[in-house]
Amino acid sequence: IYAGSLVNPELLTGTRKDCEIYNSAKMTLEEVLEVMRQASAEGKEVVRLHTGEPSIYGAVREQMDALDALGISYDSCPGVSACFGAASSLNLEYTLPEVSQSLIITRMAGRTGVPERESIESFAAHQASMAIYLSTGMLRELSKRLIAGGYSGDTPAALVYKATWKEEQDFICTVETLAETAEKHGIKKTALVIVGDVVRHGSYARSKLYDPDFTTEFRIGTGEAKSRREE
């Protein structure tokens, strides 16, 4: 049972000929659960194939609760969310020393609401790295709210279409040109927005972990080693 609107169909090419395949994009939760229940009763193995990392915008909790109620056991497998696939494509580090040590994963409110305390403005006020999902159709509003929250209009941003797919397209822009960039390249959905100075990674501090003067559990820093010799 795969999320047909998001899962790359190439992932289904390795299935056995007798495998029953269901596209959950055309199904309700109840229909998905009935397929699972029936298959379990028949002793079959079921794969519920989500996109990216299921724990992020995957609507998996309601499925797990229902399976628990039915007494059907299951295992969860971790995946790679779009924000991490995009970081790999763009060679980004979200947590650059003295630039940002936090990554905020969020979305604009659409037909699925967002708690008021989790507004784009409140998150933008932190000036941390942000990965914004499910908001491609609201980029003008997103830009306004990011700027209202504290980001300057020229803050670096990236628009990543279909991260990790063969069709992936990456565009570096700014907070104020997100909508313009999407329109120019015909991007209307299935894109991730990344915001923050880490996108351009122009100025940051060297990490302490590999600094020769820094002592860790595994090695003594040069400064401390010199001090010990003097003692």
Predicted regions and their residues:
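Alpha-helix capping/helix-boundary segments
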Residues: 6-8, 55, 82, 138, ...
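Class I SAM-dependent methyltransferase SAM-binding "motif I" and its flanking Rossmann-like core
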Residues: 53-126, 166-172
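A contiguous loop/helix-start segment that scaffolds small-molecule binding in enzyme catalytic cores
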Residues: 42-46, 65, 102, 110-231
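Residues that scaffold the ATP/ADP-binding catalytic core of kinase and kinase-like folds
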Residues: 10, 86, 142
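Short, acidic/turn-prone active-site loops that include or flank metal/cofactor-
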Residues: 5-8, 20-30, 80-82, 101-102, ...
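Class I S-adenosyl-L-methionine
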Residues: 1-77, 179
